[in-house]
Amino acid sequence: MTRPQAILTDIEGTTSSISFVKDVLFPYARRAMPAYVREHGGHPQVRHWLNQVADEIGEDVPDEVLITTLQTWIDEDRKHTALKALQGMIWEDGYRTADFSAHIYTDAAIQLQAWHAEGIPLYVYSSGSVPAQKLFFAHSDAGDLSGLVSDWFDTEVGPKRESSSYRRIAERIGVPAPEILFLSDVIEELDAAKRAGMRTALLDRLEDYPTPRSADDVGSHQRVESFTQLVL
């Protein structure tokens, strides 16, 4: 099999630890959400996303209700585009004030840089908003890695468990789906990418999944525990 013409990667559980997102980013956004909405709710971009939240719950409600709804969605890990956009805005403040830096596994940082040096285009597809993705890579533990990525995709391109989303990405980057390798820790996402024709690899990191996924669950996906084990 020839080397892929492009690599598409997830972030949480793939390039970076699940615990960083769950234990650092989500709680930070939850704590900061009330003050952020009260202070910036009049900004057109912020109001755009707040209006989407109001549309979702089907009511003309005050901001305090929207704040409570957003915090509940954080607790539920809802993959709602408006929530992800607002979280990204809040995290931008945290990155810029150095309240935290984004975790990235050493093997992922090294391999992403190696693939970039070899001329393999790299793309990111995450449920986090595109601005949040860019901040994540720009403020990583390994330094600014944002320049390695050719383009970014979030749930505005479609849900991550639907094959149509991956077909859309292939069309946008101009690479045939069979020539794209998709990396993720979520089997359902890999299944969707494979149905779209992409090559797939499951990141089954012991740090995130102490009990390895079974062969039945992994199916036809390549299974690795780090980026260094990937066979292109």
UniProtKB/Swiss-Prot annotation:
Catalytic function, reaction form: 5-methylsulfanyl-2,3-dioxopentyl phosphate + H2O = 1,2-dihydroxy-5-(methylsulfanyl)pent-1-en-3-one + phosphate
Cofactor note (record): Binds 1 Mg(2+) ion per subunit.
Protein's pathway: Amino-acid biosynthesis; L-methionine biosynthesis via salvage pathway; L-methionine from S-methyl-5-thio-alpha-D-ribose 1-phosphate: step 3/6; Amino-acid biosynthesis; L-methionine biosynthesis via salvage pathway; L-methionine from S-methyl-5-thio-alpha-D-ribose 1-phosphate: step 4/6
E.C. numbers: 3.1.3.77
Pfam families: Hydrolase
GO molecular function: 2,3-diketo-5-methylthiopentyl-1-phosphate enolase activity; 2-hydroxy-3-keto-5-methylthiopentenyl-1-phosphate phosphatase activity; acireductone synthase activity; magnesium ion binding
Keyword list, A-Z: Amino-acid biosynthesis, Hydrolase, Magnesium, Metal-binding, Methionine biosynthesis
Record bears the keyword ATP-binding: no
Keyword Transcription regulation: no
Obligatory cofactor(s): Mg(2+)
CDD domains: HAD_EP
Any Gene Ontology biological process: L-methionine salvage from methylthioadenosine
PANTHER family hit by this protein: ENOLASE-PHOSPHATASE E1
Membership in a protein family: Belongs to the HAD-like hydrolase superfamily. MasA/MtnC family.
Function: Bifunctional enzyme that catalyzes the enolization of 2,3-diketo-5-methylthiopentyl-1-phosphate (DK-MTP-1-P) into the intermediate 2-hydroxy-3-keto-5-methylthiopentenyl-1-phosphate (HK-MTPenyl-1-P), which is then dephosphorylated to form the acireductone 1,2-dihydroxy-3-keto-5-methylthiopentene (DHK-MTPene).
Subunit text: Monomer.
Protein name, as recorded: Enolase-phosphatase E1
Species lineage: Bacteria, Pseudomonadati, Pseudomonadota, Gammaproteobacteria, Lysobacterales
